[in-house]
Structures are given as structure tokens and as C-alpha cells.
Amino acid sequence: TLGRAMIRLYDVTGGTLKFEDTDITKLEGKALSPFKQRMQIIFQDPYSSLNPFMNVEELIGEPLDLREKLGKRERRERIEAMLNKVGMDESALEKYPHEFSGGQRQRIGIARALVVSPEFVLCDEPISALDVSIQAQVVNMLEDLQQEMGLTYLFVAHDLSMVRHISRRIGVMYLGHIVEISPAKELYKDPLHPYTKALLSAIPIPDPRRAREIRRIALSGDVPSPSKMPGGCPFVTRCPYAMPKCRESAPVLREAAPGHQVACYL
């Protein structure tokens, strides 16, 4: 939800969203259009995000038709070049989504998002619907494209090992609240929020000797309904270190170390 609000697929009910120095929450219509081209999304499900009645050329070309006025030849060249960047060739152009595997469909979805040369890309769990054997290939491709095209990613994921691999900076959310923000290496080395510590302790470790040295943090308590949150800290019902003041007021993000923020009273 936060990511989709950031690219204005959802309207926000409060606060500001700044792209560079412009608050895009105040923009509509033609004023917002240039920013929409600079922000794109790679959807989670490659099976439902592609129109089954459009072939690959139409799917990748549609964003170009909406955002740029290109001649037929230049349009075709842009589509072919983008298709090659995601590891597919021109033989796919006349085919339809049902003729491809899940990994190939996601590559088409990535090409569709990047063909207009955006600057900011929301990757909404782009590998969670893919076979495990393909996930690493897609992530490595996304990293290569990031370097080649100068992209900024907001990568939404629940796979903590994959998050560690692809991220430079991580924000941890609990029930819609950001509880910790940190450079990736520092977060995995020294997590500060109790929820982050519990998450990282749950990562499977293939080495049995090392696994025995890790203390798993099992959370108790009930997960509150997002529509009926408790007073104070959103994590208070499950936190093993909860104090009376945690129920009275929610802690705000504070800087615990350079670039490392945490919303906790501890």
C-alpha cells in the first residue's frame, strides 16, 4: 500500500510524498503525468498483470504509446531493445502471455515497466510468485538493469535472504508502521527493534553448528487488527520488552546511529 501510494496508484489521506523537491500528492492530471513516466511498477503476479488478449509487442509498446510519440520503426526498435535487455528475443513479439512460463511472463512485465526509461521503480514482491529456481535469475537481472539504467528500486519482499542480497537500505514495517530503517549490512549485523530481531532470528541457517548458536525469538501475544490498533506502540501486544509507556504513546523514529533509525523506547 505504501509503495503504491508513492507512485500515486493510491491517493494518500495525509502527509506529503516528494519526488525530488515536488510534492506529488498535490498534483493531478497533466501536472502529474510527467512524474508517472518517471515512476513505474513491476507487479507481483505475472499471470494476472498481463492482458491475455495482447501480444508481447502490444504489451511492451502500450506504455510507449501513452507516454511518447514514436514512429513505427523507432517504436519497434525500442521494444526489441528492451526485450533483449530482459533476456528474450524478437521471436516473442507476436506471442501471447499464455505461451510463456511464469519467469518469462515476469521478464515481459519488467520490460513493460522499464521501456519508458523510468527513474524510480516499485518492485512489488516481483519474485514471490516464481519458482525458486528462477528467482535468483530474475533478481540478478534486476540488479544488472539497475546498474545499466541508473534505476532506484523500492523492493517490497518478505524473503529476508533475498532482501539482504538486493538491498542497500532497508525499512522494516509492522502493521503499516515503519519500525526501523538502516543500511542493509548494519541491520543484519546489529538490529535494534525487537520485531526486527525476531524476524532475523527466523532466517534458516543451513549450517547446523551455526544454527545451534542462534537463539530463536518466538513472539507471543495476539496480532491486532490493522483497523483496530491498540494505543501506543503498534508492536506492544507482542513485544517481550513492553513497558507501561509503550501502551501510552507510540515511539517515533529516532537516530540510534548514523543512518540507522528505530522507533523504540529501549
Question: Can you say where each PLM-predicted feature lies in the sequence?
Answer:
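P-loop NTP-binding/switch modules centered on Walker-like glycine-rich loops
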Residues: 126, 130, 134-212
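A short, proline-enriched helix->beta-strand linker immediately N-terminal to the Walker B motif
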Residues: 115-119
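Conserved ABC transporter NBD signature motif
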Residues: 15-23
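Conserved ABC ATPase "signature" region
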Residues: 22-23, 73-91, 200-201
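ABC ATPase NBD coupling module
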Residues: 24-40, 66, 186-191, 224-230
